[in-house]
Every structure is written in structure tokens, then in C-alpha cells.
């Protein structure tokens, strides 16, 4: 189950990276970008924990949040 959800999440993230992201200006305050962070988190921890880490990261990515290098733990 987790494997299938991971593949689904990775597919959705890749769709965003290749089809939607090129149409909007770069806004991510972190490196790696939030979408790349999500890919790495899901690959490393699976759909549930990786997805939770990705959501927390995206929630921090705003003008009053942090910035700089923030790798997947």
C-alpha cells in the first residue's frame, strides 16, 4: 500500500515539476526546492512520513519563514 501511494505521490510531484513549475516564476526560499525535497522525502521515508515532511516544508516556505540549505533529515 505504501509503495503504491509513494509512486502516486512521486508521479504527482513530477507532473508539477515538469508541467506546472516551468510556467510560474521560482519562489522557493530553500535549497533543494520544495518539490525536490518532497521527492527525496517520499523516496527515503515513504508516502506517509515523507509526505508529512514535505507538507511541513511547504508550510515553512513563505516570506516570513526560513531560507537557505534545508536537506531531508
From Swiss-Prot:
A GO term from the CC aspect: plasma membrane
Top-level division of the source organism's lineage: Bacteria
UniProt membrane topology term: Peripheral membrane protein
Keywords for the protein's UniProt record, in alphabetical order: Cell inner membrane, Cell membrane, Membrane
Record's subcellular location: Cell inner membrane
Major localisation: membrane
Pfam families recorded: YidD
Coiled coil residues, start to end: none
TM spans (from-to): none
Similarity-based family: Belongs to the UPF0161 family.
Physiological role: Could be involved in insertion of integral membrane proteins into the membrane.
This protein's name: Putative membrane protein insertion efficiency factor
Amino acid at each position: 500500500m505504501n509503495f503504491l501511494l509513494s509512486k502516486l505521490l512521486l508521479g504527482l510531484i513530477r507532473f508539477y515539476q515538469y508541467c506546472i513549475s516551468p510556467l510560474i516564476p521560482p519562489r522557493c526560499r530553500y535549497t533543494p526546492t520544495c518539490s525536490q525535497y518532497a521527492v527525496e522525502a517520499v523516496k527515503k521515508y515513504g508516502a506517509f512520513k515523507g509526505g508529512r515532511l514535505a507538507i511541513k516544508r511547504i508550510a515553512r516556505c513563505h516570506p516570513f519563514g526560513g531560507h537557505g540549505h534545508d536537506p531531508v533529515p
